[in-house]
């Protein structure tokens, strides 16, 4: 335990803050929790959580893969181009690293899947589309990615959300398993929840994994 006394407004006890008994969780353990979160989200049909977590997972893999690249968009697209797209069982030029990056920005910043909400899209986007529509296709429908011309300057991109999340999960899982030391040594500070308990009536212990 790492002692760190502090005061909480309305509470006179002493706080001891540190890491959970048994030591810190390593990067692999925390990434495994993200894998599990995506699986559970898909199983419970919480598709918003499944997609946002999948897009965040790409961010994490990209930082491990290209730690010296300071521009997040460049390392994000590099991991997609070098790793993800090369292993997709279905592909389409419109499901590009550029469009996935702008989908990520729209989802995380505005809760939208429309890449055109980003003012940089018209200038920097490649294989531009009118909209990106994550879709739940029938199980018997074999196509996973559709591009529809709706009479506008750019087409609309539809992709199978479950397929995309499952592929990101599978490819990222295989990639981390094949790069264990790289993952362990990466300078990540991944999310984890702190928990608390009373040690005595006047002492609160807060610890995180």
State the predicted function of each range.
Residues 2-48:
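Charged alpha-helical initiation segments
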Residues 34-37, 53, 103:
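Short, hydrophobic/aromatic alpha-helical segments in well-folded domains
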Residues 35, 39, 61, 108-111:
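A structural signal for well-ordered alpha-helices, especially hydrophobic packing surfaces
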Residues 44-89:
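Short, contiguous, well-structured surface segments enriched in hydrophobic/aromatic residues
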Residues 81, 85-197:
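Long, charged low-complexity segments
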Residues 26, 41-49, 68, 92-95, ...:
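Conserved aromatic-histidine-acidic binding/catalytic patches
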Residues 196-209:
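Glycine-rich, aromatic-bearing surface loops/beta-hairpins
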């Amino acid at each position: 335990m790492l002692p760190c006394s502090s005061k909480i407004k309305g509470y006179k006890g002493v706080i001891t803050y540190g890491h959970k008994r048994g030591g810190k969780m390593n990067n692999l353990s925390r990434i495994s929790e993200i894998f599990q979160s995506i699986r559970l989200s898909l199983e419970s049909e919480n598709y918003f959580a499944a997609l946002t977590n999948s897009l965040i997972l790409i961010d994490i893999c990209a930082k491990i893969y290209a730690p010296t690249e300071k521009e997040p968009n460049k390392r994000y697209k590099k991991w997609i181009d070098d790793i993800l797209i090369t292993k997709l069982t279905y592909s389409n030029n419109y499901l590009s690293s550029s469009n996935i990056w702008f989908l990520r920005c729209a989802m995380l910043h505005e809760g939208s899947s429309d890449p055109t909400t980003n003012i940089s899209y018209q200038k920097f986007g490649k294989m531009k589309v009118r909209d990106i529509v994550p879709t739940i296709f029938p199980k018997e429908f074999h196509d996973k990615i559709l591009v529809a011309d709706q009479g506008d300057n750019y087409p609309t991109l539809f992709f199978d959300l479950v397929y995309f999340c499952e592929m990101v999960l599978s490819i990222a899982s295989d990639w981390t398993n094949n790069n264990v030391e790289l993952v362990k040594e990466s300078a990540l500070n991944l999310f984890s929840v702190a928990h608390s308990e009373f040690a005595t009536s006047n002492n609160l212990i807060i610890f995180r994994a």
